């Protein structure tokens, strides 16, 4: 973040406790809450240090308490502190595409500076009610299982649940690819408090699948903002807002549809809890910060559709000790419009995307929103899969032959549906060799309707595996002949 203050308001560090600093200013020049202040000076080794902090409390006696956005190693009492007079300001616009930033909006990919003309502050009000787009509309992803059974709302929030190695990253990259191709939109990825290795792997995979175009960065489809788990709590608490601010520019100024990924929303709450304890606030339920709902609401309310464009957010949700009643996931659930649950059992069967069709949910799955045809097809698919699930114990013990003719037909159709829910991805072409498929909603509904009515009972179930629409399944059946 560039600091250019003509009449510098300078204070002095009076106390340092880990990532928390107390700074004294003159009585008539106290900085505002959320102002960025920068500690400048030399440490004992003679090395220049510059640490940006954010004002959190006004203590009295002309002192403020601030939380550091980077390590406070080498800082000493008596060092000069410059009040920038504004909140943290980060670069926005097309120059951010294909780049990796830290919480301060500084590029960390060794590809040179980014122009910060007209950067935006990370603390901004949510859109006014009169500016919101209140029309319920589906955000079409081109992914069959999502569009049919747990459709995303345009401008909504989606929770992504899944353990390690079940295909979260590939699903995220496919969504980034599809929004760029089908909606002319862009994506912003906020890595909040996760592993550095995962961030590096994601960057490498994005370059390999051309989501990030190394030869021409402006043709990239995503901007990345990272605050890893080794960063101070202040950085992890604010990196989500940095990513959101970049996304808001694409929505409000460029009038685009934007996908905002937050991985992981739990780490945002966790960092807020650490900061709250460092500031001496009384903890609330299970040791979380008393302002948990306010902080979560402040972030989530800015993620919405306006009359200009939309931000649709997909948030990975870590559930501590698998306890869904923990205040962090429980507060997150209140804001979600849909959940996409990834299943290890489906991944083990080789069915990708491994989205669990029975556990994934959406508030959009209503006949008045989707239309009778879509809703009826989705419910029939779920009913068939549920019946198959109930019959699996019987099949395991007695075998298929002991089922009634009706149940055998249900099982055969359910197995076809299960395989037809798989799909080759564009971003997976490099390691599967199969060309990716974007399947329109009408083709998806048509395909599943025909499986349910029995029109395709004579096709082998293998012909439905890893294909796009129904025509491809029929063509594949001819080759299996």
Curated annotation (Swiss-Prot):
Pfam families: ATP-synt_ab, ATP-synt_ab_N, ATP-synt_VA_C. It is found in: Plastid, Chloroplast thylakoid membrane. It catalyses: ATP + H2O + 4 H(+)(in) = ADP + phosphate + 5 H(+)(out). It is an enzyme of class 7 (translocase). GO terms for cellular component: chloroplast thylakoid membrane; mitochondrion; proton-transporting ATP synthase complex. The keyword Transit peptide does not apply. Gene3D superfamilies: 2.40.10.170, Bovine Mitochondrial F1-atpase, Atp Synthase Beta Chain, Chain D, domain 3, P-loop containing nucleotide triphosphate hydrolases. Its EC number is 7.1.2.2. GO terms for biological process: proton motive force-driven mitochondrial ATP synthesis. InterPro entries: AAA+_ATPase (IPR003593), ATP-synt_VA_C (IPR055190), ATP_synth_F1_bsu (IPR005722), ATPase_a/bsu_AS (IPR020003), ATPase_alpha/beta_chains (IPR050053), ATPase_F1/V1/A1_a/bsu_N (IPR004100), ATPase_F1/V1/A1_a/bsu_N_sf (IPR036121), ATPase_F1/V1/A1_a/bsu_nucl-bd (IPR000194). Coiled coil: none annotated. ATP binds at residues 162-169. Belongs to the ATPase alpha/beta chains family. Produces ATP from ADP in the presence of a proton gradient across the membrane. The catalytic sites are hosted primarily by the beta subunits. F-type ATPases have 2 components, CF(1) - the catalytic core - and CF(0) - the membrane proton channel. CF(1) has five subunits: alpha(3), beta(3), gamma(1), delta(1), epsilon(1). CF(0) has four main subunits: a(1), b(1), b'(1) and c(9-12). This is ATP synthase subunit beta, chloroplastic. It comes from Oltmannsiellopsis viridis.
């Amino acid at each position: 973040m560039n600091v250019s203050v003509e009449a510098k308001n300078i204070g002095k560090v009076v106390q340092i406790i880990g990532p928390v600093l107390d700074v004294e200013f003159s009585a008539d020049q106290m900085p505002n809450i959320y102002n960025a202040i920068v500690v400048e000076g030399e440490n004992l080794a003679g090395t220049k240090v510059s640490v940006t902090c954010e004002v959190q409390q006004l203590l009295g006696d002309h002192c403020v308490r601030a939380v550091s956005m980077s390590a406070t190693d080498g800082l000493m009492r008596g060092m000069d502190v410059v009040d920038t007079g504004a909140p943290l300001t980060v670069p926005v616009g097309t120059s951010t595409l294909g780049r990796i930033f830290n919480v301060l909006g500084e590029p960390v990919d060794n590809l040179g500076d980014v122009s910060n003309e007209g950067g935006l502050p990370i603390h901004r009000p949510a859109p006014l009610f009169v500016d919101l787009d209140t029309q319920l509309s589906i955000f079409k992803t081109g992914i069959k299982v999502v569009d049919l059974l747990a459709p995303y709302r345009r401008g909504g929030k989606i929770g992504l649940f899944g353990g390690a190695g079940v295909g979260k990253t590939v699903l995220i990259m496919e969504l980034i690819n599809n929004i760029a191709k089908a909606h002319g939109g862009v994506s912003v990825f906020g890595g909040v408090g996760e592993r550095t290795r995962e961030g590096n792997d994601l960057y490498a995979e994005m370059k390999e699948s051309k989501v990030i175009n190394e030869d021409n960065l402006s043709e990239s489809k995503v901007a990345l903002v990272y605050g890893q788990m080794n960063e101070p709590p202040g950085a992890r608490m604010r990196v989500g807002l940095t990513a959101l601010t970049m996304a808001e520019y694409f929505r409000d100024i460029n009038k685009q549809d934007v996908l905002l990924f937050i991985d992981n929303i739990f780490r945002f709450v966790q960092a807020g809890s650490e900061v709250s304890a460092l500031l001496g606030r009384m903890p609330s339920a299970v040791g979380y910060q008393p302002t948990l709902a306010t902080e979560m609401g402040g972030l989530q309310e800015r993620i919405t559709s306006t009359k200009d464009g939309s931000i649709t957010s997909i948030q990975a949700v870590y559930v501590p000790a698998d306890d869904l009643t923990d205040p962090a996931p429980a507060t997150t659930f209140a804001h979600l419009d849909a959940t996409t649950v990834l299943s290890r059992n489906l991944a083990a069967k080789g069915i990708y995307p491994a989205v669990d069709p029975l556990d994934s949910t959406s508030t959009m799955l209503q006949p008045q929103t989707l239309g009778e045809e879509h809703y009826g097809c989705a419910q029939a698919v779920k009913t068939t899969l549920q019946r198959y699930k109930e019959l699996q114990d019987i099949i395991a013990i007695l075998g298929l032959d002991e089922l009634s003719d009706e149940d055998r037909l249900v099982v055969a159709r359910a197995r076809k549906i299960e395989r037809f829910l798989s799909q080759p991805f564009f971003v997976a072409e490099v390691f599967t060799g199969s060309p990716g498929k974007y399947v329109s909603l009408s083709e998806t509904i048509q395909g599943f309707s025909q499986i349910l009515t029995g029109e395709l009972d004579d096709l082998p179930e293998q012909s439905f595996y890893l294909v796009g629409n129904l025509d491809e399944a029929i063509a594949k059946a001819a080759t299996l002949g």
